[in-house]
């Protein structure tokens, strides 16, 4: 009898705990600053107001199930793609079509006030983040146009950078085939035009995103901007020394600037052992990978195909959720809780951490933070409050 009572007590405690973190999650404004599903919408005709379970990590119904309130949709194409600006507009069109079909579920927002109104109406607040300065094609007028369509941040450089800002890949790799390389005549950092881009973004109230930026570009941005900046999807270099992650002095500089670091879920950025696992996997299936590439598939889609085909093997490579939490905690301990948030990179990454199987699983992050002893106030900041502060601070008054 005593054992039965004890078991009932344990079950009730677990249920109360689940209700507690779920209630906290539901009351917070949950923001994800980086999701790449628009790339698949443009490339493959994916329509994400349908059930895409097993195909993508995201769709409209699953965002709602995961308690997501604000999604920044990445507008991205490779840096060497022709007509990048036209492609950006195609991606934007795909979101606009979903919004038009589902006005009761999702709305495009252009301001902090719009966002709060959408959340109050229980609609997903959607905005764009343009991933890569190459998409403005060296034209400030095109930057203005993308802003008018709802782009509220610009990632100044992707791996293959524009002519006016060097990327982390540029500054780290001497080999163009590795995703970026510097011409011997080209200086690192922002050019004069790059500084004009920063100035124009400050004038518009458009957030400057330093994810993918090279070190010199980062410091040039810090010097040039008059507004708080973001890293829309980056993690911690001291934990995983990957060129895409932020070093301690950069994290401190973002905090001093009043900005925010949105932690990326990419296993390669949060687990120092993942690179070796991935290399071994791709070596094992090299012939199949090469065959896929020869059919004209992009690298991302070729890898995605293999990871899904060999899902059982892929699953053993996934880092635990606790590793993502370690990156969040590292930033908190280094600079305080006011400067960290979530930038998942869902549908831009091929593998996710364990438990984070798709966008329905955001509440498990809240649970992990509750289990770590963080207060409701601090968790609310991490889930979205910190990003909202930066968004509001950038708006032109």
Question: How would you label these PLM feature ranges?
Answer:
Residues 2-4, 152, 200, 233, ...:
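Basic side chains
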Residues 12-14, 44, 219, 243:
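Alpha-helical transmembrane segments and their juxtamembrane interfaces
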Residues 9, 227-228, 259-260:
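Conserved active-site beta-strand-loop modules that form the wall/rim of enzyme catalytic pockets
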Residues 19-184, 241-397:
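N-terminal hydrophobic targeting/anchoring segments and the immediately downstream early-domain regions
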Residues 1-24:
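Bacterial Sec-dependent N-terminal signal peptides
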Residues 149-230, 235-244:
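Divalent metal-binding pocket/active-site signature
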């Amino acid at each position: 009898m005593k054992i039965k009572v004890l078991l009932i007590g344990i079950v009730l405690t677990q249920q109360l705990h689940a209700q507690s973190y779920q209630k906290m999650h539901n009351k917070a404004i949950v923001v994800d600053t980086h999701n790449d599903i628009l790339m698949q919408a443009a490339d493959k005709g994916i329509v994400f107001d349908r059930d895409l379970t097993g195909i993508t990590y995201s769709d409209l119904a699953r965002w709602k199930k995961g308690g997501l309130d604000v999604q920044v949709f990445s507008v991205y194409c490779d840096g060497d793609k022709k007509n990048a600006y036209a492609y950006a507009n195609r991606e934007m069109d795909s979101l606009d079509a979903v919004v038009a079909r589902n006005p009761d579920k999702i709305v495009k927002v252009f301001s902090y006030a719009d966002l709060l109104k959408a959340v109050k109406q229980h609609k997903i607040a959607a905005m764009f983040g343009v991933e890569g300065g190459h998409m403005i094609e060296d034209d400030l007028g095109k930057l203005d146009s993308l802003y008018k369509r709802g782009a509220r941040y610009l990632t100044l450089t992707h791996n293959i950078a524009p002519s006016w800002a060097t990327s982390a890949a540029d500054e780290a790799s001497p080999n163009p085939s590795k995703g970026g390389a510097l011409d011997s005549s080209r200086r690192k950092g922002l050019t004069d035009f790059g500084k004009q881009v920063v100035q124009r973004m400050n004038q518009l109230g458009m957030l400057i995103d330093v994810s993918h930026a090279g070190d010199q570009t980062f410091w040039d941005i810090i010097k040039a901007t008059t507004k708080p900046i973001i890293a829309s999807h980056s993690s911690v270099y001291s934990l995983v020394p990957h060129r895409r992650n932020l070093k301690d002095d950069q994290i401190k500089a973002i905090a001093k600037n009043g900005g925010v670091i949105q932690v990326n879920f990419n296993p390669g950025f949060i687990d120092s052992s993942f690179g070796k696992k991935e290399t071994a996997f791709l070596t094992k299936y090299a012939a199949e990978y090469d065959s896929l590439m020869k059919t004209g598939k992009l690298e991302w889609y070729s890898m995605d195909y293999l990871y899904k085909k060999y899902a059982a093997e892929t699953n053993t490579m996934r880092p635990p959720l606790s590793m993502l939490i370690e990156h969040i905690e590292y930033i908190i301990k280094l600079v305080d809780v006011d400067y960290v948030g979530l930038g998942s990179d869902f549908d831009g990454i091929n593998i996710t951490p364990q438990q984070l199987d798709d966008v329905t699983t955001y509440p498990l992050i809240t649970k992990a933070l509750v289990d770590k002893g963080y207060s409701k106030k601090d968790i609310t900041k991490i889930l979205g409050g910190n990003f909202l502060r930066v968004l509001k601070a950038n708006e032109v008054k």
